[in-house]
Curated annotation (Swiss-Prot):
This is Acetyl-coenzyme A carboxylase carboxyl transferase subunit alpha. It catalyses: N(6)-carboxybiotinyl-L-lysyl-[protein] + acetyl-CoA = N(6)-biotinyl-L-lysyl-[protein] + malonyl-CoA. It comes from the Bacteria. GO terms for cellular component: acetyl-CoA carboxylase complex. Residues 35-296 form the CoA carboxyltransferase C-terminal domain.
Length: 319
């Protein structure tokens, strides 16, 4: 799988290109007198050290780029690697089935759960079909339908957040985009089942919050959560999207900063180089966090669960 190196990773990309070149030469001519294996191993170790050095000092804008990485695992990737017996459920029973939201029933270590998440696309056709992960009102109404179903059957709800924001098109506004988001916020605050939310990529504004009201809210190490994109903020404050790196630092969009502000509960470590480097490793880490969170919430009765969730919402903004 191509790693699609970002701009700040170019020194790593150059080393990896050398490794690939030497490996190809070694395979083509096994009768070479020089030992390329040792050189390849040396370069691999150097690449790991360089990656560790670069990733030990990432800025908010670099993390924002990682959150949008084209090879980053999406909701369906986590479903495939964490859950079993997934049965997708479609439609909002009112207008349409929005492919930017996926959801359904699955098992987490044998336990039935309801999964809901944003889904972006990788290839052009899929990106268009998924609307680049930007849900319309019918997507959020589908999500609410599945949440209400989960409450009826006493299933914990697990959500995966990864969207640049709710779709801002005219049709979406005409069909009640703001109402759909607001209704989800209200209804999620009073569902009588545990809710665990995880930001796996971009957490963009109300489009993220509409499936982000939970008893536990986690973020992957290189994900972001904000009321507006850095480019949008820069365009408003400095009249130029070129100031996005400055805006990203000022906005406090990273997982560790939001943990400091008590906006989230846990930061889930990613493999060296980001989640796209090792799907199985990040899936294992996320699964462990989900199991731990559900174990913590299982001991609470309905009243305790709702009171705790209410207090959590009321404490936002107080540090």
């Amino acid at each position: 799988m191509s790693l699609n190196f970002l701009d700040f990773e170019q020194p790593i990309a150059e080393l990896e290109a050398k490794i690939d070149s030497l490996t190809a030469v070694s395979r083509q001519d096994e009768k070479l007198d020089i030992n390329l294996d040792e050189e390849v191993q040396r370069l691999r170790e150097k690449s790991v050290e360089l990656t560790r050095k670069i990733f030990s000092d990432l800025g908010a804008w670099q993390i924002a780029q990682l959150a949008r990485h084209p090879r980053r695992p999406y909701t369906l990737d986590y479903i495939a690697n964490i859950f079993t017996d997934f049965e997708e459920l479609a439609g909002d029973r009112a207008y349409a089935d929005d492919k930017a939201i996926v959801g359904g029933i699955a098992r987490l270590d044998g336990r039935p759960v309801m999964i809901i998440g944003h889904q972006k696309g990788r290839e052009t056709k899929e990106k268009i079909r998924r609307n680049f992960g930007m849900p319309a009102p019918e997507g959020y109404r589908k999500a609410l339908r599945l949440m209400e179903m989960a409450e009826r059957f006493k299933l914990p709800i697990i959500t995966f957040i990864d969207t640049p924001g709710a779709y801002p098109g005219v049709g979406a506004e005409e069909r009640g985009q703001s109402e759909a988001i607001a209704r989800n916020l209200r209804e999620m605050s009073r569902l009588n089942v545990p809710i665990v939310c995880t930001v796996i990529g971009e957490g963009g504004s109300g489009g993220a919050l509409a499936i982000g009201v939970g008893d536990k809210v986690n973020m992957l190490q290189y994900s972001t959560y904000s009321v507006i994109s850095p480019e949008g903020c820069a365009s408003i404050l400095w009249k130029s999207a070129d100031k996005a790196p400055l805006a990203a630092e000022a906005m406090g969009i990273t997982a560790h900063r939001l943990k400091e502000l008590k906006m989230i509960d846990s930061v889930i470590p990613e493999p060296l180089g980001g989640a796209h480097r090792d799907y199985l490793a990040i899936a294992a880490s996320l699964k462990a966090q989900l199991l731990a969170d559900l174990s913590d919430l299982d001991v609470l009765n309905d009243e305790e669960l709702l009171n705790r969730r209410y207090q959590r919402l009321m404490n936002y903004g107080y540090c």
